[in-house]
Amino acid sequence: MKKIVLAGGCFWGVEEFLSRINGVVSTEVGYANGRTENPTYEDICTKNTYFAEVCLVNYDENIISLKELLAKFWTIIDPTSLNKQGNDVGSQYRTGIYYVEPSDLEEILNSKEELQKSYSKKIVTEVKPLENYYKAEEYHQKYLKKNPNGYCHIKLD
């Protein structure tokens, strides 16, 4: 089992999209790479905590490779948009790939480099080691499964 943490704007839609991928064993939404301890949703929306809304993905690399998972992730974000995805604006909505295993870095950078060839604008999706992670409040977990008509900036159908 491998882990990767992905930020692609509002984490509700990102989690729903990723949870539907064959080989993804589990997902959980949370806050990553910020400046404080134990942030709340209100903190990340109203204070300068610099956390990103993220989805922690556990996947079976015998079913889906990191390269394949990232290829799917790139399709749901605008990697050239800084701190904005859809109607959501703020540093918490930045795009990012946060790796747990340093051995994943080369594959991530290769994926980003390959994608850059199809964009004239610079890709601003950050690639960093996972520095910290806090699970989001329970009402955010599997939000769109619990609230099928809830807000989502990603086209899921």
Curated annotation (Swiss-Prot):
Leading EC class: oxidoreductase
Q: Which GO terms describe its molecular function?
A: L-methionine-(S)-S-oxide reductase activity; peptide-methionine (S)-S-oxide reductase activity
Q: Give the GO biological process terms.
A: cellular response to oxidative stress; protein modification process
Q: What is its EC number?
A: 1.8.4.11
Keyword rRNA-binding in the entry? The reply is no
List UniProt keywords, sorted A-Z.
Oxidoreductase
Q: Which GO terms describe its cellular component?
A: cytoplasm
Report the family membership. Belongs to the MsrA Met sulfoxide reductase family.
Summary of the function given for this chain in its UniProt record: Has an important function as a repair enzyme for proteins that have been inactivated by oxidation. Catalyzes the reversible oxidation-reduction of methionine sulfoxide in proteins to methionine.
According to UniProt, the name of this protein is Peptide methionine sulfoxide reductase MsrA
Supply the source organism for this entry: Clostridium perfringens (strain SM101 / Type A)
